[in-house]
Amino acid sequence: MDAEAGVGGADQLPWRQHYRNLLLLAYQSFGVVYGDLSTSPLYVYKSTFSGRLRRYQDEQTVFGVLSLIFWTFTLIPLLKYVTIVLSADDNGEGGPFALYSLLCRHAKLSFLPNQQSADEELSTYYRNGFTSRHGSLPWLRRFMEKHKNARTVLLLIVLCGASMMIGDGILTPAISVLSSMSGLKVRATGLHDRSVVLLSCIVLVGLFALQHRGTQKVAFMFAPIVVIWLFCIGGIGLYNIIHWNPRIYQALSPYYIVKFFRTTGKDGWIALGGILLSMTGCEAMFADLGHFTSASVRLAFITIIYPCLILQYMGQAAFLSKNILDMPTGFYDSIPGPIFWPVFVVATLAAVVGSQAVISATFSIVKQCHSLGCFPRVKVVHTSRWIYGQIYIPEINWILMVLCVAVTVAFRDITLIGNAYGVACMTVMFVTTFLMALIMIFVWQKNIIFALSFFLLFGSVEVVYLSSSLMKVTQGGWVPLVLALIFMSVMYIWHYGTRKKYQYDLQNKVSMRYILSLGPSLDVVRVPGIGLIYTELVTGVPNIFTHFTTNLPAFHEVLVFLCVKSVPVPYVSPDERYLVGRIGPRAYRMYRCIVRYGYKDVQRDDDNFENMLVMNIGKFIMMEAEDASSSASYDTANEGRMAVITTSDDYDSPLAVRDSNDLADSMTMRSTKSESLRSLQSSYEQESPNVSRRRRVRFELPEEDDMDQQVKDELLALVEAKHTGVTYVMGHVYIKARKNSSFFKRFAIDVGYSFLRKNCRGPSVTLHIPHISLIEVGMAYQV
């Protein structure tokens, strides 16, 4: 009996742990995912009744607005996002770039230049159960893969969605903080609008000024603030239903929607621009999926978010149906007097939490754009030791702050900001609907009827709301359009210039026949050390190498062509990150190393990179020797042959490592350097503490009698070169359009791309290359 109970308890333990983790993630999601969505009741009714709908302020119109809010909130956030879209995650990640990444992997739609077949062998590349032989609409796949213009249009649609999400990062803090602060005017009736705007700006500046500290120190407060806020507004809504108008439940009938449009006509259609604000923030359910699970996000929405917000909208409608004149400040007027100030404080905190979540999402979007080659290089700071992916981008932070304060000061009106906010949110939602339809066809391999039904059902609703928002372009709706145009231009010009640069490198790479004709010395003096040549090419030798050796006919004894590239997956496992291969015969001592990162990976300043590189090359040499022993000699060229080097490889590292931090070893490692270079390095290390604190190691060959002498010689040459020192060689490229190019190309390359390249961070900075070891080779490209 006890044994059976023990077995049963053991079986139940994983289930208990699973549900405990699910509840914990659902609780934490309130502070990250739902902050923006939960603050919508602050301004929905005010924005809806701000225009021509003022002429229809009566109980029946309020019932019609509530019916629209209820069915819109049920159809889009609940049915579309919670039920369907959350299932389209990219290995746990969400957002427009996650959908685009899925499409690029399951159909050849990507513009990433240096992709190779080895990338498709990544464990997270394809969706489980996917097979290209059973795809639906093969003609559509072939059409999009064949026609560059179709793929360009798809990219522009994704960039439009990303630009609008960046616009959300500007508009959400402005409307949320200003709405919460406007509650002061309910009790302090003599307070001027300028004072409310000033207080809002102070809060906004403080919010952005604290971004560099990260959110981990106060993140534990986010979830309880939002939960308290939700229970507050849910309880207030229930109180208002009972106290003011218990018949308000009748408004849930679609009959009142029909009656609403019969009464208001075109004015009611224009008022939809205010009603759509009830679902702003639901895109965050999908975009911020990475830190949670779809099950936890669904659980939080269904059990708490949906009922609390519906109760609040119903309660506010019940209050307004009996207090029509209080429409401009309906939310705060509906709060019972004794709890006004506590609710005001919680509302302000909830607005800050909602703004924080959107700002963090904006940083993530910019990082993804950069990883996919669609945004200039910016500084990315990892702000959390425990939460992977929590980042801070200083340049973007200050741009957002300036634009957010400018919008707040310029408009000073929640309605005008709401008009702009609605355009941005509905555009992002429609982009998601469009991409989801393609996901159903290319990734889920569903029937065309299923995908078309999804697109027509949700797309038609979103188009109606979007058209209503666009009617208010002159009343603030122009702001997100202008912002999106600016950000899209920056993204596409950078993408265009980067692609042209890669195409030039690809067309002008050095042939292997020429390299082999030079012999093992490469027709230059080979000096001790390792030369790391950065290139975007994954095959061949870049022309920067011949350009360098032509002007300075000397190079290092060991050459490594290093390519750091992005692949269209969110994360690359460390065990799959490194691809190592050989260029030319063994005597040439030339290797290729490809380091792969996902679009959500953060490239940290890893002081162990050089050591990892040497270890991986050593592993490759041993693997190649094992393969060659069972086949032909590998003294011949092996160009194009790459191997994935993993930390858990069956081949143990042939190199022994020991710390070399003592003075004697340090001097031994530097013995081959000139006195002036050693002095310069010492000065540099004193000025750069991070460099001086880097771990120094010394490699040694183990005493193995059975090791092949050629392999031992090659490993010994690699170790001695590492101890001599590593030099980084990188091209400093100037790109100019050809004289016969079109006006667009000349403007994009000579003006736009040139300006962005000069004002963004240099590649050596983003790759954390020490300046003391860097050689930049000037190159001029005519594209």
Curated annotation (Swiss-Prot):
Major place of residence: membrane
Region called Disordered, residue ranges: 662-691
Subcellular location: Cell membrane
InterPro entries according to UniProt: K+_transporter, K_trans_C, K_trans_N
Keyword Transport: yes
GO cellular component, one term: membrane
Extracellular compartment segments: 43-61, 174-189, 239-268, 320-338, 412-422, 469-475
Ranges that cross the membrane: 22-42, 62-82, 153-173, 190-210, 218-238, 269-289, 299-319, 339-359, 391-411, 423-443, 448-468, 476-496
Compositional bias annotation for Polar residues: 677-691
Keywords of the record: Cell membrane, Ion transport, Membrane, Potassium, Potassium transport, Sodium, Sodium transport, Transmembrane, Transmembrane helix, Transport
One GO-annotated biological process of the protein: potassium ion transport
Residue ranges, Cytoplasmic side: 1-21, 83-152, 211-217, 290-298, 360-390, 444-447, 497-783
Pfam families in alphabetical order: K_trans, K_trans_C
Catalytic activity: K(+)(in) = K(+)(out); Na(+)(in) = Na(+)(out)
Membrane topology, from the record: Multi-pass membrane protein
NCBIfam families to which the protein is assigned, alphabetical: kup
Biological function: High-affinity potassium transporter. Can transport sodium under high sodium and low potassium concentrations in the extracellular environment.
Membership in a protein family: Belongs to the HAK/KUP transporter (TC 2.A.72.3) family.
Protein name in the entry: Probable potassium transporter 2
UniProt organism field: Oryza sativa subsp. japonica (Rice)
